Amino acid sequence: MWFLFAIVSVLAWGTADLFYKKGSDPKDKYSYLKIVIMVGAVMGIHAMYVLLTSGVVYEPRNMITYLPVSALYILSMAVGYAGLRFLELSISSPVQNSSGAISGLLTFIFLGQSMTGIQFFAVGLITVGVILLSVFEQRFAEAERKENKEMVDRKYKYGAIALLFPLGYALIDSLGTFADAWVFDRGMDEMQANIS
């Protein structure tokens, strides 16, 4: 059953990425903020649904406790969506999704989580591989456009500077995940954090 849920999650994640890319209009300098607001609205609706249907007794003080973590996640989304205006999804998405490996390293280093040598090697390999994949893919895409004498879309002319957006997303999102682990280690219930 877990495999079915994993497949559904991957499909939903990929579909969401396509909608984020479609909504990132390079001509609208605020398009990424509109996406952040819509994602926040959907998450707020989800929180209200959970509150109304699950019988959880929510403690509002947890909203203040969890605010720095939420701020990191919101900032990472804004940076990631802003970057979609300048990069192809096939370049930005792998870099952004390396945040899980980075947060694994952070929890290992700072929170004393255990990690075997092989796990440590795998996390490092994934992180380096994902970043190199996007760098090489961008170079190949630029070379292909030049070879085919295609006009380079204005939004893709920023090159290496545009890679700062998905890298920024990965770093900020990994800090958010690390902060999640830290808050949970200090005793906050996951459901309280989810609603916050």
Please place each PLM-identified region on the residue numbering.
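Loop-to-transmembrane-helix transition segments
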Residues: 2-9, 48-51, 55-79, 158-171
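Juxtamembrane helix-loop-helix junctions in multi-pass membrane proteins
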Residues: 15-42, 56, 172-196
